[in-house]
Structure formats: C-alpha cells, structure tokens
Curated annotation (Swiss-Prot):
Its cofactor is Mg(2+). The gene is coaD. Homohexamer. This is Phosphopantetheine adenylyltransferase. Its main location: cytoplasm.
Amino acid sequence: MTSIAISSGSFDPITLGHLDIIKRGAKVFDEVYVVVLNNSSKKPFFSVEERLELIREATKDIPNVKVDSHSGLLVEYAKMRNANAILRGLRAVSDFEYEMQITSMNRKLDESIETFFIMTNNQYSFLSSSIVKEVARYGGSVVDLVPPIVERALKEKFKTPLK
C-alpha cells in the first residue's frame, strides 16, 4: 500500500519552515501532496497560481512531492487522492490548540485519515508567512527565511532591491 500524505496551507508565501516540514514528510511517506488551500479568513498576497509556481520551484528537487490547490474541505481532497495521512507542522504550544480542533473535525469527517504532527526545527519556530512579508515590505533581508525564488518574488512585489 502506498502511503500518501497531504501537507496543506495557504503558503502565502512558502517559507523554509514549510519546506523543512515537507522535506521531512517526504522521507516518511511515498508521496506528499503540497496543497494550497483557499483560506476564506485571509486576504492572499500572492495569487493561487503564483503560490503554486513558487512551491513547485521550491520543491522541484524532491521527487515524491506533487503540488496542487483546492477550494473545499481538506478531507475531501485527501479522499480524492487516496491519501491516508494529513501532515502538519507545529511551531509552538500555541499552534497545538488550533491544530487539535482541526484534527478533531477532520477525524469526525473521515476516521480513516490520520493526522501526523512534525515539530518544526528550532531555527524556524518563530517563522510565519506573515512575518516574512512584514520583513520584506520594509526592505529587510529574508534570505534565511524563504527559498531564493520566494525572495525574488517578494522583492518584485514590494519593488525593493535585493540585499
């Protein structure tokens, strides 16, 4: 049986923290789908198409990673892909409560899909897409926070020179 995991998020933009979780998940599962979900409570900075392209470029050297988007329930997408796992990263205890609520709802919707949590490496425990955008907006260096393709895309959007 092939083990298939879904790593989902808004990825607006993808960070090295996201990439760390994806790479580690790709070592455990046969296939990992990185899925851009449309979060109705967030106003995206990058379009879905831009985010997909940034993720594809950032994960191009991980052969068992596929990139996609979805507008519905994550559990429905997982069923469509015959996935048996949802992969989630935890940065801090504060993430756990929210993730536990989502996991409980996903289990209620489909008990056959398990959620696996991976603790973020300490070097990324503070990192979020929101922080990255804030630093880039004011011309700060994001070189140690995002893949090079994302750094270039942020500089282009904010019209700031590369540092």
